[in-house]
UniProtKB/Swiss-Prot annotation:
Superkingdom of origin organism: Eukaryota
Protein's recorded name: Large ribosomal subunit protein uL14c
Native species: Gracilaria tenuistipitata var. liui (Red alga)
Stored InterPro entries: Ribosomal_uL14 (IPR000218), Ribosomal_uL14_bac-type (IPR005745), Ribosomal_uL14_CS (IPR019972), Ribosomal_uL14_sf (IPR036853)
Gene Ontology MF term list: large ribosomal subunit rRNA binding; structural constituent of ribosome
Location relative to the cell: Plastid, Chloroplast
Summary of the function given for this chain in its UniProt record: Binds to 23S rRNA.
Stored Pfam families: Ribosomal_L14
Length: 122
């Protein structure tokens, strides 16, 4: 579960490394975000000479959380870190690669472009 002021790693090659959540957009609960929810964040750490700079306000979709997710088939899954992928206004990723495993719940929320870029879908 991600809330306001939570730090997330970035799982793509857009240039940002860490973001801080400042607002939860796509969630039933306005205080917490889970996998597949859209957040607004501010870049706290970025690579030099990249299009995304430190202190930029960006939109991102959450792809991994430390909080255990319970699936309908009884399986529970959790990841080692909280991570997000930076997206544009059309919900397409701004980067061209996605690193690390991605939860398959993103497919249900129509983020198929992120799923296709991911090397591993769990």
């Amino acid at each position: 579960m991600i809330q306001i002021q939570s730090y997330l790693n970035i799982a793509d090659n857009s240039g940002a490394r860490k973001i801080m959540c400042i607002q939860v957009l796509g969630s039933n609960n306005p205080h917490y975000a889970n996998i597949g929810d859209i957040i607004i964040g501010v870049v706290k750490d970025a690579l030099p000479n990249m299009p995304i700079k430190k202190s930029d306000i960006i939109r991102a979709v959450i792809v991994r959380t430390k909080k255990t997710i319970r699936r309908n088939d009884g399986m529970s899954i959790r990841f080692d870190d909280n991570a997000a992928v930076i997206i544009n206004q059309e919900n397409n990723p701004r980067g061209t690669r996605v690193f690390g495993p991605i939860a398959k719940e993103l497919r249900d929320k129509n983020f198929s472009k992120i799923i296709s870029l991911a090397a591993e879908v769990v």
